[in-house]
Design a protein with these regions (language model features):
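Hydrophobic transmembrane alpha-helix bundles
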Residues: 10-20, 103-116, 142-160, 241-244
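Acidic, Ser/Thr-rich low-complexity intrinsically disordered segments
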Residues: 217-244
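Structured segments of extracytoplasmic/periplasmic soluble domains
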Residues: 58-61, 99, 103, 197-204
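Active-site-proximal helix/loop segments of hydrolytic enzymes
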Residues: 72-142, 147
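Active-site/substrate-binding loop(s) of hydrolase catalytic cores
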Residues: 1-90, 94
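Active-site-adjacent mobile loop/cap segments within catalytic or ligand-binding domains
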Residues: 117-215
Length: 244
């Protein structure tokens, strides 16, 4: 699992109010360490700002056409099971979401990046580079405030009786039942989303075609599980393993 927060041991202290650069927008104090509130960054800023600036420089210098941010959202969050797109990519993202919904066996919508909400990848990458910026959100009950005990099991199975109960009371923006949202389903949504983004882009931009082979799709992940596509660390040389 990734984490978009900079450690306070590496970036301290937090300000009373976080003032986003370069917009000057006031954000919550803790978002000063939030990677997805610090785009486009600056070379002499905080650790988080320098990190996002490095991403931006890579995108600009390498001439990246499409930047994809893969995220998961709690079911109590309204922006879920969707593609969030910069206005430069509205038609493109809509075609991707329509194709996924029609062919892949899961529904995914389209949301447009708010022009006045700053620091997010889908806003700032599109504003400060040539790239079309997309963000894909998959459902993740592990993140919900109404969940029960936090455990690796909840992370992997996506099952939680308290989140199910919240859904029965109309408190969720995505459906859930006792089957939950297993990690294979969530990963499969993302792999299919990336693959379809590549295919749709290549169909429309033959001169800038992207070639990618062997990407497992949603149905493959649901059928085989995530572990099927990963190397077994138990069989790896100890010199190749890193523990954190």
């Amino acid at each position: 699992m990734g984490d978009r927060w900079s450690d306070p041991l590496d970036q301290w202290p937090d300000p009373e109010v976080y003032i986003h650069y370069p917009s000057g927008q006031y954000l919550a104090y803790m978002d000063v360490r939030n990677l997805n509130r610090a785009f486009p960054g600056r070379p002499d800023g905080t650790l988080t700002e320098r990190t996002t600036y490095a991403f931006m420089e890579f995108i600009r210098r390498e001439g990246v056409d499409v930047a994809i941010d893969l995220q998961e959202a709690e079911l109590q969050y309204p922006v879920i099971s969707t593609v969030v797109t910069h206005q430069k990519g509205q038609e493109f993202a809509t075609m991707v979401s329509m194709t996924l919904t029609d062919l892949e066996g899961f529904k995914i919508g389209t949301e447009f990046s708010p022009k006045n909400l700053h620091g997010l990848s889908h806003r700032e990458i599109g504003d400060h580079s040539q790239a079309v910026s997309l963000l894909f959100e998959a459902p993740e009950p592990f993140l919900d405030a109404t969940r029960g005990r936090t455990s690796a099991d909840v992370l992997l199975t996506g099952q939680d009786e308290f989140v199910v109960k919240a859904g029965k009371h109309g408190l969720l923006f995505e459906t859930i039942d006792e089957k939950g949202w297993p990690i294979a389903v969530r990963v499969g949504r993302h792999t299919s989303s990336v693959a379809q983004t590549i295919e749709t882009w290549t169909e429309d931009h033959a001169d800038r075609a992207v070639v990618a082979r062997g990407i497992p799709r949603y149905a493959d992940l649901v059928r085989n599980g995530v572990g099927y596509y990963l190397r077994d660390p138990g069989k790896a040389s100890p010199s190749r393993l890193a523990y954190e």
